[in-house]
Amino acid sequence: MKFVDSASIFVHAGDGGKGCVSFRREKFVPKGGPDGGDGGRGGHVWLRTNRQLTTLLDFKYKKKYIAVRGVHGQGARKTGRDGADVVIDVPCGTIVRNGETNEIIADLTGEDQEILIARGGKGGRGNQHFATPTRQAPRYAEPGQKGELLMLNMELKLMADVGLVGFPNAGKSTLISVISAAKPKIADYPFTTLVPNLGIVRYEEYKSFVMADIPGIIEGAAEGKGLGLQFLRHIERTKILAILIAADSPDIADEYHTLLGELEKFEKELLDKPRLVVVTKMDIAAEDLEIPTLEEGVRVLSISAVSGQGLKELKDELWREVSGRIRAAEPLDESLG
């Protein structure tokens, strides 16, 4: 499936139905009063998150979403039926902006979250509402109000707990394929990963976390080189970054600081996230390899996705960080105090 993380759509809520001009006509009531019913409300347009969706691909093919107008009022005080609502499913992590002002309308991060994005027009009132002692036979009714219409710009930031960051061929795709159910394309050449991949890592029974693998970053990514920069927003919501560096790197320390520099140029706040350095491909490492201390307080783990070396320790460390931040984000139960 093609990965699409931005799209623009046009939404138009339904117009309200017209109020009715009608007069009561019965055999023994030759001059009945006004009995025109109200028009129905136009259909609303809603956005709803769907955890099964991971891309905005659908919106490349369908760009207009128009709700049904309300039914016009009828005689005998009959109110028209409301127009049917339109519900648009989007992935969790979708940011919705007003296409004209670029103002953020919604940041949809919750599961099954719904937001009313365009309100249907109210139905017009029938002529029964306009009778007065001096005007007992009004011959007019209200038209229905127009439904809201707007252009929406949508941007997807994937919802993941752990973000994998590294140069091309650092072993990110191999790692996520080994410790999760994700099946990314893997090959021994740079830029095999062209789009982000998500994988669910099963830690223990009833415990799991989501890992995101983005295309490799190269030096100069902040100036537009390579593929990784355009996908860096997909790690902005992660709880921890795993910086992957291959054991056969010419200079592990230099590669680490280069990666941090590119992250800082893209979004300085990314450096505020906790991070872990993972030296990969230890199965092909030189026997005399010495892994330097890269930064105070930043742990360095050595792994091999091929032999399995260090994978349990890595999962333990990632789960400890992820679960700790989940607990920290939960509101305190004041009744326990």
UniProtKB/Swiss-Prot annotation:
It is found in: Cytoplasm. GO terms for biological process: ribosome biogenesis. GO terms for molecular function: GTP binding; GTPase activity; magnesium ion binding. CDD domains: Obg. Mg(2+) binds at residues 173, 193. One of its GO terms (cellular component) is cytoplasm. Keywords: Cytoplasm, GTP-binding, Hydrolase, Magnesium, Metal-binding, Nucleotide-binding. GTP binds at residues 166-173, 191-195, 213-216, 280-283, 304-306. Its EC number is 3.6.5.-. Its main location: cytoplasm. PROSITE patterns: G_OBG (PS51710), GTP1_OBG (PS00905), OBG (PS51883). Pfam families: GTP1_OBG, MMR_HSR1. Residues 160-323 form the OBG-type G domain. Residues 1-159 form the Obg domain. Its cofactor is Mg(2+). It comes from the Bacteria. InterPro entries: G_OBG, GTP-bd, GTP-bd_Obg/CgtA, GTP1-OBG_CS, GTP1_OBG_dom, GTP1_OBG_dom_sf, OBG_GTPase, P-loop_NTPase. It is an enzyme of class 3 (hydrolase). An essential GTPase which binds GTP, GDP and possibly (p)ppGpp with moderate affinity, with high nucleotide exchange rates and a fairly low GTP hydrolysis rate. Plays a role in control of the cell cycle, stress response, ribosome biogenesis and in those bacteria that undergo differentiation, in morphogenesis control. Monomer. Belongs to the TRAFAC class OBG-HflX-like GTPase superfamily. OBG GTPase family. This is GTPase Obg.
